[in-house]
Amino acid sequence: MTLFSLLQSSPALLLSVCFVLGLFVGSFLNVVVYRLPLMMQTTWRRECKEFLQQDSQETTQETATESAGENSGTDQTPQPFNLMVPRSACPSCNSMITAWQNIPVISWLILRGKCGNCKHPISIEYPLVELLTAILSLAVAYKFGASIQLIFALLFTWSLVSLALIDFHTTLLPDSITLPLLWLGLLISLVPVFVSAPDAIVGAAAGYMILWIVFQTFKLITGKEGMGFGDFKLLAALGAWLGWAKLPLVILLSSLTGAIIGIMMMVLFKHQRSQAIPFGPYLAIAGWIALMWGDQIVAMYTGQMGL
């Protein structure tokens, strides 16, 4: 019996595997959310300095210092800094995190939310992201079962989690995630996995154009930029995965969610109206809901409208 057959015959095992897998993926996503924006900023600074032809020694020193943020030595040689190296360390005492301390959720509970060396508090966001990713992975496994759809739905879910968190913290939606997500959505439509190729192509084009038109209209009226180009690309990616027919649902859900949370932030946290609120997290939430229950929501709405 193959592993796939075993998972098909045992739903409980499938759910357990996906939950545990989600915990470890969530742990990796914490690294992505923290490091990817730093990697992007380092690249931008290096490219700008090269363009301006600044002194190469100054460029090397500043890039190494600003990118890693963890190295306090005087060596001017830039140290490797990516999603794999250097090893994760405490931002307070710079002590390396051991293997067992990387165990999702459990290690945070054992350490009582503090560094094992200096006792500096560890943000509760880390275990919450791990739990969120695990719960979403569990829901996806319950929805799709042991199928090809499950594999791609998990990739879709994990990508949206990382994009939502990065945009929430930095107001950035990295092309290194959104563009592969877009192309993968178009590629799997050839099978098709979720929607047909024509639906995916039209969905991607329409997703980009809808927000581009909104952006240009808002800018024409107010003279300000209401959103970033990353939002266009993310909605295009959602259109490629979900098809053009679910775009109205995604836009409606994301707008409602954004409006409700925005009002709550202004009332409860005195959030200034002029202060930018990232739209990516709401698109990600709406896109995931549309993947999971979009057909049922649309059917319920059209049924109530008598269509």
Positions of predicted regions on the chain:
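Structural signal for the C-terminal ends of transmembrane alpha-helices
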Residues: 142, 164-168, 189-192, 268-269, ...
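Functional transmembrane core segments of multi-pass inner-membrane proteins
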Residues: 5, 18, 149-257, 300-307
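Interhelical loop and helix-boundary elements at the membrane-water interface
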Residues: 36, 80, 103, 117-126, ...
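Multi-pass membrane catalytic core of lipid/isoprenoid biosynthesis enzymes
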Residues: 87, 94-153, 230-232, 236-237, ...
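Hydrophobic transmembrane alpha-helices of multi-pass small-molecule transporters
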Residues: 134, 138, 189, 259-266
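Alpha-helical transmembrane segments
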Residues: 5-35, 39, 213-225, 235-307
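Membrane-proximal soluble regions of multi-pass membrane proteins
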Residues: 35-125
